[in-house]
């Protein structure tokens, strides 16, 4: 029986396979971990964010090489742990090993570096298969194809073709606005800090004055997909280990309300225990609207329910962990949850 693929090469070894990198940048590699991305945990997200924070003053951009299976989760998590970064933080990986005869790894790494070196790049993004996606919008949709990642409910930031970065028009406008805001920050040496960020990085005079780093996550968050026949009493088994539940509803926001499988009482009890309830849809595109059908209307105006709108499940999981890591009251939880971060939600 053939052995399955496992991570083997270090970052430095991977870079040697793409000698063209030296033509566009000088770089240093750091080996934080060498694990299959299936084994990634929230503590690893914090470790990556901390590494970037420690090196932030010394580099112009950061590239995170990551396995594809959980890369969207890590990209979303870094979007919340490192906010408003004027320096690009780019995640990439590959469907085939770097040593493969027809690998996509070389081109993905080169294009990630190309995007990271561009003056108009900032914040957390995923570069994969010639597409650039917001860290909060990337989602792995294919298991084998080289164009495995899709930007969900938000346009691509850019495409990379023939070594040229072709930016989406609306995203290019946002880039110009971001640079203008950054120039304003540069001219204001004592810009106010965000009060909710207790671990804000004290910035030097310069471009770092608007970046915010966070170092807390609450990983007691469960994501549960509704399926036909699921019993409402499942929530009783979750109360001990979880502080928040992300419930993936049917369609545009359907939650069973039949006599045998009525979820209303179970979800009401969950909220009354002081736990957080987030409703989203298990359909990837176009988002949630609880007001459309009767099976969702009971929750449409419930103040105890957080609505995922058009966010990805990966972003919802990471954001809920981040929110619960910072907030101490229900009002704070709601305020942070509904605050758009790195284009994570636009539908209301």
Positions of predicted regions on the chain:
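Active-site histidine-anchored catalytic micro-motif
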Residues: 1-185, 189, 197-348
């Amino acid at each position: 029986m053939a052995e399955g693929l496992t991570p083997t090469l270090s970052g430095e070894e991977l870079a040697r396979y793409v000698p063209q990198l030296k033509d566009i940048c000088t770089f240093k590699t750091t080996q934080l971990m060498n694990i299959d991305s299936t084994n990634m945990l929230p503590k690893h997200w914090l470790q990556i964010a901390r590494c970037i924070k420690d090196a932030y003053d010394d580099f112009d951009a950061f590239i995170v090489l990551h396995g594809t299976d959980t890369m969207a989760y890590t990209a979303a998590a870094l979007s919340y742990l490192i906010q408003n970064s004027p320096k690009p933080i780019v995640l990439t990986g590959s469907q085939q090993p770097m040593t493969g005869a027809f690998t996509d790894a070389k081109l993905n790494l080169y294009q990630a570096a190309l995007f990271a070196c561009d003056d108009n790049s900032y914040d957390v993004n995923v570069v994969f298969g010639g597409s650039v996606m917001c860290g909060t919008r990337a989602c792995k949709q294919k298991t084998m194809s080289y164009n495995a990642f899709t930007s969900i409910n938000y346009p691509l930031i850019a495409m990379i073709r023939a070594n040229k970065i072709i930016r989406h028009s609306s995203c290019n406008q946002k880039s110009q606005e971001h640079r203008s805001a950054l120039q304003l920050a540069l001219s204001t040496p004592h810009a106010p800090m965000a009060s909710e960020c207790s671990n804000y990085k004290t910035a030097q005079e310069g471009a770092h004055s608007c970046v915010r780093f966070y170092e807390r996550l609450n990983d007691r968050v469960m994501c549960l997909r509704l399926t036909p026949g699921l019993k409402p009493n499942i929530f009783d088994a979750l109360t001990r280990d979880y502080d928040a539940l992300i419930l993936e509803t049917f369609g545009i926001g359907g939650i069973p309300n039949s006599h045998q499988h009525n979820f209303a009482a179970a979800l009401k009890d969950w909220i009354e225990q002081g736990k957080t309830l987030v409703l989203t849809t298990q359909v990837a595109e176009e988002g949630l609207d609880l007001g459309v059908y009767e099976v969702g209307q009971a929750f449409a105006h419930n103040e105890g329910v957080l609505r995922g709108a058009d966010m990805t499940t990966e972003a919802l999981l990471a954001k809920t962990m981040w929110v619960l890591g910072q907030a101490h009251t229900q009002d704070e939880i709601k305020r942070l949850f509904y605050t758009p971060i790195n284009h994570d939600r636009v539908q209301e």
